[in-house]
Amino acid sequence: MMTDSMRLVWEKAKEAIRSQVPDQGYLMWIDPLRVVKAAADSVVLGCPNPLAKKWLMDHYRGLLESAMQQAAQRPLKVLLEVAECVAEAPETPEEAPQQLCLPAFADIPRPSSGRLLNRDFTFDSFVVGDCNDFAYSAALSVASKRSKLHAPLYLLAQTGLGKSHLSQAVGRQVMQESPEERVFYITAEDFTNEMIGALNTGTISSFKEKYRRNCDTLILEDVHFLSGKNRTQDELAFTLDSLMETNKRLVFTSAYLPSEIPKMHDSMRSRLNAGVISSLEAPDFRMRMRILQRKANSAKIALPMDVAEFMASELTGDIRHLESGIKGLAARNSIMGRGIDLKMAREVVGNIVRNRKALTLGVITKMVCKYYRVTEEDLRSRSRKQAIARPRQVAMYLGRRYTDQSLQAIGRTFNRYHATALHAVGVVERHIRENGDMREPVLFLCGKIEAGEF
């Protein structure tokens, strides 16, 4: 039967997933899932409860679909429903449960090299306002087939303000308008690791050919990771020269201006400065209102005007705080069956901003030490053991995200340089993006901070 064969596919997919998520996360969220329904182009995975379903939707949606499609070797829609008792089910679903990924696999543009693009990051879904309209227009111009803008685009913004959204929107637009063009979407760390691998295996000529001759659009995230990477900077500089000479599209993202990135060669810095540098600022009140309404529509909840105004007034940080607010409302609305009103909004916002002013780097350090069972002296030591280095990196990341401390100040707190703190932030951000083994501890600590539990 179709369901039986799909169960074999699911077992194969689980093996692939297991290698990409921490053991604790796999046992808690992935292993309990069962195939309950299947059709030729879709599969329904049963979750034990609504909380598990919501967590999977928020954290593992892309990984589940990608693994199933690779295991089945065909386009598949992956759907979730709560099914405490898994029994034999009809092959064709009688009622469509909540869909995990809307378009079929074949309809998802895939870069020629590098990472998959987020399906939600399109120009249409980007909320435009005074804080980002130039960046939006510049990105749209770069992506257009009729663009006269041949200079590189450098998107500058702090975490959570939309630079990755725009960079990936460029990639999606290019692939949709010009499927024959080769789009490479990678991080600076990916480029570094690939280059090191090529050097170690004696394939550096193929590596150079790939990026200099077989690339039409290069989207390079987190260029600040290049700090102190002399060999990588040299190789990338030659690559950029080759691409710019042939008017290829170049998009860079960073939280820092080229002039602010330490240990960067002048030659590399000049190439990054050669294009259009466009910043994305924090949204103002009207912009936050629009974002909240857009997020509420996506979450399929009705957001009363007084609730939207209250949340827009209180959640003045990055856009992720607004997303957290909408998710909090949606969860309470769904699980508790309560209507969305100001009382609920105050509860949700309170969990996000409670005691924010009291949060210091010292408090964060104590939280991290308690979680990882290390001492503050350990974090300030010169030890590079993973059991010490990982917690230190997490503390630096949380300090950068939740306090107004500079990278220099954060580095000094742990007896490290500015560049080391910058590297730590980049490492943790990568683990969060890629479901690395630091992801769940970091998200847990973020949740504690945003709930005021520190």
Swiss-Prot record:
UniProt keyword Cytoplasm, yes or no: yes
Question: Which SMART domains did the record assign?
Answer: Bac_DnaA_C
Where, subcellularly, is it found?
A: Cytoplasm
Query: Which keywords label this protein?
Result: ATP-binding, Cytoplasm, DNA replication, DNA-binding, Lipid-binding, Nucleotide-binding
Q: Which InterPro entries match?
A: Chromosome_initiator_DnaA (IPR001957), Chromosome_initiator_DnaA-like (IPR020591), DnaA_C (IPR013159), DnaA_dom (IPR013317), DnaA_N_dom (IPR024633), DnaA_N_sf (IPR038454), P-loop_NTPase (IPR027417), Trp_repressor/repl_initiator (IPR010921)
GO terms (BP aspect): DNA replication initiation; regulation of DNA replication
- A GO term, aspect molecular function: DNA replication origin binding
Superkingdom of this protein's organism: Bacteria
* Chain positions covered by the region annotation Domain II: 83-115
Where does this protein hold ATP? G160, G162, K163, S164
Give the record's GO CC terms. Answer: cytoplasm; plasma membrane
What Gene3D superfamilies does the annotation carry? Answer: 1.10.1750.10, 1.10.8.60, 3.30.300.180, P-loop containing nucleotide triphosphate hydrolases
Reply yes or no: does the keyword ATP-binding apply: yes
Region listing for Domain I, interacts with DnaA modulators, in residue ranges: 1-83
Q: Where is this region: Domain IV, binds dsDNA?
A: 334-454
Q: Where is this region: Domain III, AAA+ region?
A: 116-333
Give the family per the record.
Answer: Belongs to the DnaA family.
Quaternary state and interactors:
Oligomerizes as a right-handed, spiral filament on DNA at oriC.
Present the record's domain note.
Answer: Domain I is involved in oligomerization and binding regulators, domain II is flexibile and of varying length in different bacteria, domain III forms the AAA+ region, while domain IV binds dsDNA.
Free-text function comment from the UniProt entry: Plays an essential role in the initiation and regulation of chromosomal replication. ATP-DnaA binds to the origin of replication (oriC) to initiate formation of the DNA replication initiation complex once per cell cycle. Binds the DnaA box (a 9 base pair repeat at the origin) and separates the double-stranded (ds)DNA. Forms a right-handed helical filament on oriC DNA; dsDNA binds to the exterior of the filament while single-stranded (ss)DNA is stabiized in the filament's interior.
Under HAMAP family, the record lists: DnaA_bact (MF_00377)
Q: What is this protein called?
A: Chromosomal replication initiator protein DnaA
The scientific name of the source species is Desulfatibacillum aliphaticivorans
